[in-house]
Structure formats: C-alpha cells, structure tokens
Amino acid sequence: MEAEVDKLELMFQKAESDLDYIQYRLEYEIKTNHPDSASEKNPVTLLKELSAIKSRYQTLYARFKPVAVEQKETKSRICATVNKTMNVIQKLQKQTDLELSPLTKEEKTAAEQFKSHMPDL
C-alpha cells in the first residue's frame, strides 16, 4: 500500500513538473513564432487554461496528501495490532502447551498475501 501511495505522489509531482515545462515552452513558442496570430486560438487563453489545469492538479494533490498520511498511519496501526495478536497467541500456546496443526494450503496462501501487503510484520 505504501508503494502505491509513493507511486501516486511521484505521479503528481511529475505531472506538475510536466505542466510547468509545457507552460514554459508555450510561452517561448508564442513569443518567438506567433507574435500576432489571429487565425488560431488566443495564446493567452491557452495559457490561462493551462494554469487552471495546473491549479486543479495542485488541488487534487492537496486532497490526496492527507489520505496518503492516513493510509500510512492506518497501516502502522494494523501491523501493530497484528503483531500484538500474534504475541498473545504465542504466549497462550506456551501457557497451555497447545500445538496447532499445520496451516492448510489456503491458509498459507492467505498468510503470504497478507505479508506481501504488510512487509512491516
């Protein structure tokens, strides 16, 4: 889950960087090649639209950031709870001299999938 969050964060950063570059290139192209082109869409309008798109990306990123933080905190709490539960089970097994039967194939698969999503365990 953390890898996905980091990947999304990098995607937003790259998108913002790409938009900055596009805006710079458009401004440069307009200044050098199309000083007074009347037949095409107004370059100033295009730049305003680009600025609006960039603003929407920044707003989306600002909304995304707290979600990413909450996901990391939730993951940490889940891992801590699972670790505590595992410790309690192990203590109970020792106190009662109880041995559990080996895991079934499905249980092993589920445990592996869980560990792959929660490497902190």
Swiss-Prot record:
One of its GO terms (cellular component) is cytoplasm. One of its GO terms (biological process) is mitotic sister chromatid segregation. Its main location: cytoplasm. InterPro entries: Ska2 (IPR026762), Ska2_N (IPR042091). Gene3D superfamilies: 6.10.250.1380. One of its GO terms (molecular function) is microtubule binding. The modification Phosphoserine is found at S101. It holds the Pfam family SKA2. Keywords: Cell cycle, Cell division, Centromere, Chromosome, Cytoplasm, Cytoskeleton, Kinetochore, Microtubule, Mitosis, Phosphoprotein. It is found in: Cytoplasm, Cytoskeleton, Spindle; Chromosome, Centromere, Kinetochore; Cytoplasm, Cytoskeleton, Microtubule organizing center, Centrosome. It comes from the Eukaryota. The keyword Cytoplasm applies. Belongs to the SKA2 family. Component of the SKA complex, composed of SKA1, SKA2 and SKA3. The SKA complex is a homodimer organized around a central W-shaped coiled-coil structure, formed by the interacting domains of SKA1, SKA2, and SKA3, each end of the 'W' is extended further by the C-terminal microtubule-binding domains of SKA1 and SKA3; the complex forms extended structures on microtubules. May interact with NR3C1; the relevance of such interaction remains unclear in vivo. Interacts with the MIS12 complex subunit DSN1. Component of the SKA complex, a microtubule plus end-binding complex of the outer kinetochore that stabilizes spindle microtubule-kinetochore attachments, promotes alignment of chromosomes at the mitotic spindle equator (chromosome congression) and assists suppression of the spindle assembly checkpoint. Kinetochores, consisting of a centromere-associated inner segment and a microtubule-contacting outer segment, play a crucial role in chromosome segregation by mediating the physical connection between centromeric DNA and spindle microtubules. This is SKA complex subunit 2. It comes from Macaca fascicularis (Crab-eating macaque). The gene is SKA2.
